Amino acid sequence: MKLDESKIIDIECDHIRTLEAKKITYRGLEIYAVKRSIYTSDTERAFLHKSGINTAWWCGYVEAVQDMQDSFGGRRCFEDNVIKLSCGNKTKEYILANVHGGYTYAFYGIPLVLNDGQRLFLGWDYNHWPDTEDCVTYQEILKEGMKVVDSMQEFQTT
């Protein structure tokens, strides 16, 4: 991953470490799958794994169509996991399955819509809590990201 792309995936919290990051381009938009951890050292993570404690989780970021920036309403509240798109008199809502915000959305106000100044991104945590590390795979993150891209492009053409 190029250095300038790191600001997209590191935008959330400075105490969260990126362990692995992968990117694909789908229908002209980028989808990132990122494995994160709150533990700072590999030694610490290895010790906790031996104790049966998972220490990381996958999350995803999807590039949004830039001219749709004004269409994203974000989450109404962090529990309901709904992205609302509005364009003129059209409104569409869709739910990201199995997404939850965790404490970061509640206390730090992390936005669902991320903007690095040039590109717009939607971001979500699938399994924010470390004890659910193995619940969601890299492939599932990409599959969900593709659904988001499909939904945005479908909305633009209706």
What are these regions (language model features)?
Residues 1-16:
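Charged, compositionally biased non-catalytic regions
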Residues 14-87:
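Amphipathic, interaction-prone secondary-structure segments
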Residues 61-120:
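Short, internal acidic amphipathic alpha-helical interface segments
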